[in-house]
């Protein structure tokens, strides 16, 4: 039985990820419930679990309504965030491995955007489901072409988190929770106007977005080649980039 991955764009720029296998599904960071319920019902799916990468309202806002419709669904979130994600039914921490839909998910600590931010990693390690994975549900830590703002962590925290993502295989899909790619790459082209890989990717993403298509998922390899934050050699370099990006205003 093969898994499939689906992206639901919601609100202004959020992306809710749905992982389906057979007639069962897992949803990641549901900002709102209605589009998820519509998709599940249209495809005859049963919601088995909700994965929460961090506590921000635009990631957990749809969870209460989803649980009213699917009360048997697990809510998997960081144990360290149990007070801010109170509906969690399974607390996890760095290094934990959980099983959902017959697959293993690894939990990694990528705290920086928030103090208890986690990511969920699925390796390409299942002979019965060979085309699904590797991938990373990375929330707001790693974005296509960027990284999350440092609301509760430091540049050192973000540097460490991005190094953990960089250690994943290049083909790992980057399933982040916001469609910020075009603006991120526009900023990057201003910093490195002669970088052909960045400018080429920016033009590709601009074309996708002009048609209303998502640029996601990305890949770890693409981020290594074109994401200035992933290329930072020190936490100090990352801090300088983050400060510059925080004060940048797109035209």
From Swiss-Prot:
Zn(2+) 1 binds at residues 54, 56, 113, 140. It catalyses: an S-(2-hydroxyacyl)glutathione + H2O = a 2-hydroxy carboxylate + glutathione + H(+). CDD domains: hydroxyacylglutathione_hydrolase_MBL-fold. Keywords: Hydrolase, Metal-binding, Zinc. It is an enzyme of class 3 (hydrolase). Zn(2+) 2 binds at residues 58-59, 140, 178. The keyword DNA-binding does not apply. Pathway: Secondary metabolite metabolism; methylglyoxal degradation; (R)-lactate from methylglyoxal: step 2/2. GO terms for molecular function: hydroxyacylglutathione hydrolase activity; metal ion binding. Monomer. This is Hydroxyacylglutathione hydrolase. It comes from Synechococcus sp. (strain CC9902). The lineage of its organism: Bacteria, Bacillati, Cyanobacteriota, Cyanophyceae, Synechococcales. The gene is gloB.
